Each structure stands twice: as C-alpha cells, then as structure tokens.
From Swiss-Prot:
Root EC class: ligase
GO cellular component entries: cytosol
Chain positions recorded as Mg(2+) 2 binding sites: E417
Cellular localization per UniProt: Cytoplasm
Listed name of the protein: Lysine--tRNA ligase
NCBIfam families: lysS_bact (TIGR00499), PRK00484.1 (NF001756)
InterPro entries membership: Aa-tRNA-synt_II, aa-tRNA-synth_II, aa-tRNA-synth_II/BPL/LPL, Lys-tRNA-ligase_II, Lys-tRNA-ligase_II_N, Lys-tRNA-synth_II_C, NA-bd_OB-fold, NA-bd_OB_tRNA
Gene Ontology MF terms: ATP binding; lysine-tRNA ligase activity; magnesium ion binding; tRNA binding
Pfam family, any one: tRNA_anti-codon
Taxonomy, superkingdom: Bacteria
Binding sites annotated in the UniProt record for Mg(2+) 1: E410, E417
GO BP terms: lysyl-tRNA aminoacylation
Length: 500
C-alpha cells in the first residue's frame, strides 16, 4: 500500500511539473476556454460509422471534438466524451509538437482536436490532429484498471473517477435521468400539476420516521428536514389543485443499508375524487408504459429473476400474504383479524417466527413485522399488498368493512417496498384522534411516531375531497431498471462516513 502511494505521488509530481511547463508555454495560464466542439463522438459514429475509407477520404469532413484521453495506442489517442469514444491520430510531427508544447499528453488529460475524419485500417473512425489544444491537465492518474474501479468504497467516495472509468456507472445514471423524465412526462399527460413544497418543516410529518433536526437562526426555532411532503401536498388539494405531484428529496435520520440512504428521492402525488384502487391501476399503467418506453419491453432482468411489468400485478392483503408464504404454520393458517387484534397472541406469534419485539409495538406493528420477516423478501414480481392496519397508517382512510385496517397498499418488487399509497383520511375528527394516538406512542418510546400537526387539522376542517395519494421511491425503482442491488449504485453521492 505504501509503495502504491509513493508511486502515485511520484506520478502527481511529474504531472505538476508538466503543468508548469504548459503554464510557461501556453496562453490562459494553461487553462484555455476558447475551444468549441462541433460534434460528439456518438454523433460522428452514427453519421459516418458505415462509410468506407474511400468515401470518407472523398468527403474530407472537417470536425472539432473534445474529450478526455483514455488510452494511447501508438500514434492514436482514444478520446472519451459524454456520448462515447473516438480516436484522434497524431503523426510524428504532431507528437513532437505535443512534447514541445505540453511535455507530452497523459491519460486523463482533456484536449480539443480539429481535423479531417478518416477510417483506420482496423475500421475505426479517427480525427486527424490538424489543430489541437490541451484544455485541462489532469494532475492525478486514473486507476490502472481500464474498465473501472475495483474498490466499491472508492467508487462511492470518488464518484467522479468512477464515472470516468466505469461505463456501467455512466449508463446507470443516464437511465436514472430517463426514468425520472419518463415519470414526469407520464404524470403531466395525466393532467397532474408539478409543485414544490417546503424542505424544512416546523413539524415533521407525512411518514413514520426519525427526522433530521436543524436550527433556523433568524427565527430562532428548531426545524426539521422533511421526511415526506404529504401534508403540504394534501393542503394543496384542499386549496383546489385536484391533481398534484412532486419529485424531490426526503430525509430520514435512520441507518444505512443496501436499500436505505438517509437522503433519497420520492415522487409523491395526490388525486382528488379517487381511491387506492385507482392508484393501483395508475401505477400498473405507469410502470408498464415506462418499461416499454425505456427498455422496449415490459420484462427486464433483475439478478436471477425476470421482472414482468406487463401486468396485471398480484394483489393480496397483508394477512393473505402472511398465510400464503407460511403454508406449514398452523397457527398462521388459522389466524383471523380477531386474533390479530389480541396483543398477547401477536407477541407470541412474533416471537415464534424469530422476531424480537418492542414493548410499545401495537398489534398492527406486530403484524407488519411478521409480514416483513416471513413474506416481504419473497415478493419478487410486482405485488400490491393491501389491508394495512389503521394503527400503523395514521393518515389513511379506514376500510368500510373492517375498521381495523385501512384502504392502503404498499407495492413490492424484488423483495422490497417500492411504493406506498392509500385513500386519504379526510375526516378531520378521526385524523385529530389518530394524531393524538401517535403522540402517545412517541411518549411511550416510539421515535418514529408522528407529531401532532394542528394546522393540518385546520386544513382538513376546511374540507378535503375524497382523495388518494401515493409515494414512489425513485432510487429503488432505478435499481430495478439498472439491475443493481444496492441503493448506493444509483445515488450519485451516497451518504458515507467521513474518512479519518
């Protein structure tokens, strides 16, 4: 390790010396900003890739390209820009001039090249270096592995290097951008209005999670980074905007895992005069449409599985799912909602399936934990799980036929939750009581229980029409579309512990 650091320091020193040479011999202190590119690599490949050598010679096509030097192969330089790669040819005269002006070029340097487009003997396009300019001298060498970094932590800490050398990473983040754009376009076509709501809240709400706390100096009050935009978006529906959506960050002061990052992106939307079943239909249509648009198919590989977004998706209640994935457990097979309402029964059952419980957990929390332990990891294909207990769904409307559960679902793919939606609770008095129950739970030790939000109750008292709302985790959805299995691979700069 020490030898590697010494070698790297030697290379950096050599490059700094070259930069000093450039500063003395070139304008703009060695960092010019007048070169203008005419074409990207992919544009030239698409337009001229099928031409013969003779056809290109006859065309005499002049171009200007710019990019990072990724390899040197004899007289050829491999340049990389955002679209791909193309070669530049330096004859002996050019090579001598490069050495004289720049003390030679290194891997990682960024250059601009003007010249005629040609075809090499191996059938590769290249630009003859007739005019050229060093635009940025790279002072640090790229990793020795041409096809990417081997150390995962370095990839996350130095994403800029990862993006330079790892094509898979570049493609993953291009796909992320396409997924977000496709979702936005889908929602706009469905007549939803995109809005922006506060990122700092006086009262955190909209989800059960531990918030980040900050201090507003001018107001001299504690504020919270938002854990969800839900309560503000529903205020907008009260105000008359019947279809709204927001794509933005949420912050939850919780642990790191392959599926959790404290800062993550959600698309949350609300539609008046709809219920949770309408959300399910809309979600199926959205994901099927996006898969076809971006991948050309509704089926995509994910690890050892093939995820089918074609629909219709599986739908079952939480209780049904627990029974389905525990066929040999006689107690579970005989369980009804009457048993689920019995706290002693649920604690014993949770213990029997290997769950360490908290004393303040309710019957609904215990049911959800049993589901998460025994059923959730097995939900590989798109599946809507309905029938969430009211005591863990403080913002959802109670089901008409069973007031223990709500008109809520969570959507699972690949063994993890991707979305959460429900028919909204628009009964101001019921919401008031549920907020009070959440305060009691927080006092009993549940750090993730919600706060009481008096202004939101006031908003509901003005009248929220029948409404359904849903949040979709963008990061987890992108994991599926890019066949990656850790959330850090689809977040450009994931949370990391500072280096010593």
């Amino acid at each position: 390790m020490t030898e590697h650091i010494q070698d790297e320091n030697k290379l950096i020193a050599e490059r700094r010396a070259k930069l000093e040479h450039v500063r003395k011999n070139c304008p703009a202190n060695g960092h010019p900003n007048t070169f203008r590119r005419k074409h990207k690599a992919a544009e030239l490949q698409a337009q001229f890739g099928d031409k013969t050598k003779e056809e290109l010679e006859a065309l005499g096509f002049q171009t200007a390209i710019a990019g990072r030097v990724m390899a040197k192969r004899g007289p050829f330089l491999v340049l990389q820009d955002v679209s791909g790669r193309i070669q530049a040819y330096a004859d002996k005269g050019v090579q001598a001039d490069l050495k004289d002006r720049y003390a030679g070029l290194d891997i990682g340097d960024i250059i601009g090249v003007e010249g005629t487009l040609h075809l090499s003997g191996k059938g590769d396009l290249y630009v003859n270096m007739e005019r050229y300019e060093l635009l940025t001298k790279a002072l640090r060498p790229l990793p020795e592995k041409f096809h990417g970094l081997t150390d995962q932590e370095t990839r996350y800490r130095q994403r800029y290097v990862d993006l330079i050398v790892n094509e898979d990473s570049r493609e993953a983040f291009k796909m992320r951008s396409k997924v977000v754009a496709a979702i936005r376009n889908f929602m706009i076509k469905k007549e939803f209005m995109e809005v922006e709501t506060p990122m700092m809240h006086v009262i955190p709400g909209g989800a059960s999670a531990r918030p980040f706390v900050t201090h507003h100096n001018a107001l001299d009050i504690e504020m919270y980074l938002r854990i969800a935009p839900e309560l503000y978006l529903k205020r907008l529906v009260v105000g008359g905007f019947e279809r709204v959506f927001e794509i933005n960050r949420n912050f939850r002061n919780e642990g790191l895992s392959p599926r959790h990052n404290p800062e993550f992106t959600m698309m949350e939307f609300y539609m008046a005069y709809a219920d949770y079943k309408d959300l399910i239909d809309l979600t199926e249509e959205m994901l099927s449409s996006i898969a076809k648009e971006l991948l050309g198919d509704t089926k995509l590989p994910y690890g050892e599985h093939v995820i089918d977004f074609g629909g219709p998706y599986t739908r079952m209640s939480m209780l049904e799912a627990i029974k389905h994935y525990n066929p040999d457990n006689a107690t579970i097979q005989a369980m009804t909602y009457e048993e689920v309402k019995n706290i002693d029964f649920m604690r014993k059952l949770a213990k029997d399936v290997g769950i360490e419980t908290e004393t303040f957990w309710s019957c609904g929390q215990l049911l959800e934990e049993i589901f998460g332990e025994t059923a959730e990891p097995k939900l590989m294909q798109p599946t809507f799980i309905t029938g969430y207990p009211a005591d863990i769904s403080p913002l959802a409307r109670r089901s008409d036929g069973n007031d223990f559960i709500t008109d809520r679902f969570e959507f699972f793919i690949g063994g993890r939750e991707v979305a959460n939606g429900f028919s909204e609770l628009n009964d101001a008095e019921d919401q008031d009581n549920r907020f009070k129950a959440q305060v009691e739970a927080k006092d009993a030790g549940d750090d993730e229980a919600m706060f009481y939000d008096a202004d939101f109750i006031t908003a509901l008292e003005h009248g929220l029409p029948p409404t359904a709302g849903q949040g979709i985790g963008i990061d987890r959805l992108v994991m599926l579309f890019t066949n990656t299995h850790t959330i850090r691979d689809v977040i450009l700069f994931p949370a990391m512990r500072p280096q010593a």
